[in-house]
A protein has these predicted regions:
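Coil-to-beta-strand transition motifs
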Residues: 18-19, 106-110, 117-123, 133-137, ...
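Beta-strand-rich N-terminal accessory domains
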Residues: 1-63, 67-71, 212-234
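Active-site pocket scaffolds in enzymes
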Residues: 225-269
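Extended, loop-rich substrate-binding clefts of extracytoplasmic carbohydrate-active enzymes
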Residues: 66-119
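A short, structured loop/turn motif at beta-sheet edges
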Residues: 84-91, 116-121, 150-154, 220, ...
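Histidine-centered catalytic micro-motifs
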Residues: 139-147
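Active-site/ligand-binding surface loops and adjacent short beta/alpha elements
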Residues: 135, 148-232
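Short, well-ordered beta-strand segments enriched in hydrophobic/aromatic residues
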Residues: 9-14, 113-115, 122-130
């Protein structure tokens, strides 16, 4: 079920399914700022990645001598969350452990996600509580898909990705199955802006490590108008779209990486 809030500057909609942001509009702006989740292209808007990011080796992990099937990006994005609190400018969703979660993730937990409007910004805060009697490993990430182009009549190639400062990050390499290989190579050396070209994502996502910038923005080259995402405090940030950039760009701060192709199936690996 969708819920809406507004503050005079922004109007936001979020869904109890996955606690997912699904619409963002600016007053007087050109229209929708998030991807439409067209199922023929990519059927999501801005899913949360919890309790893991990316893929697991062979699509499963092992814990306590038991095998757990594991799809991409965790379980929270595909579960119904409860609207636990709301106000004129915020929505708080809660996902608590139950029989369904324990069948997929063998720890007791709660995940609380708050989306709040602050001026021209959306602030999302996730709080994870371990309610089990043993330590719980987990990862957390965001997979926000920005509409690109966000101005009617423009093309994706009219946009660029801008960093807060000049960067020379390392790219965490993944294999054809989306698993980390352990290899890291330089990417965007000495650059503060990266033009969006049709072939930029022909090799899938670009996972960056070692960024010094506190934000990354999708910027319209001609006008300087932008959509900015904070990545401060996150060890990894990914850029991703489908080949050809068919209407969206994801900027994804992650605490965590996909499984390793050369390691075992324990989650801690």
């Amino acid at each position: 079920m969708r819920h809406q809030i507004e503050n005079g500057s922004l109007t936001l909609e979020a869904d109890t399914h996955g606690a997912e942001l699904c619409s963002l509009r600016k007053a007087g702006g050109p229209g929708e700022l998030l991807w439409s989740a067209d199922p023929a292209v990519w059927g999501r808007h801005a899913p949360l990645c919890f309790p893991w990011c990316g893929r697991m080796r062979d699509n499963y992990f092992e814990e306590g001598g038991r095998r757990y099937e594991a799809g991409s990006h965790g379980v929270a994005r595909d579960m119904e969350h409860m609207l636990s609190a709301s106000g004129p400018d915020f929505l708080t969703f809660r996902l608590g452990w139950n029989g369904e979660t324990l069948a997929l993730w063998p720890w007791k937990f709660s995940l609380e996600t708050t989306h709040r409007l602050e001026g021209d910004s959306v602030v999302t805060v996730c709080r994870v509580q371990n309610e089990d009697s043993r330590p719980m490993p987990f990862q957390l990430g965001f997979h926000t898909a920005l509409r690109c182009p966000f101005t009617p009549g423009k093309a994706a190639t009219d946009y660029l990705v801008r960093f807060e400062r000049e960067e020379s990050p390392l790219r965490v390499r993944c294999d054809e199955n989306g698993l980390a290989t352990g290899e890291e190579t330089p990417v965007f050396p000495g650059q503060s802006a990266v033009p969006l070209t049709p072939g930029l994502f022909d090799d899938d996502s670009i996972c960056m490590k070692g960024l010094r910038s506190s934000w990354i923005q999708l910027e319209e080259a001609e006008t300087g108008r932008y959509l900015r995402i904070s990545c401060e405090g996150y060890p990894y940030t990914l850029l991703w779209s489908k080949p050809g950039i068919p209407g969206f760009l994801c900027i994804e701060p992650w605490h965590g990486l996909p499984g390793r192709a050369d390691l075992g199936h324990a989650f801690s690996e």
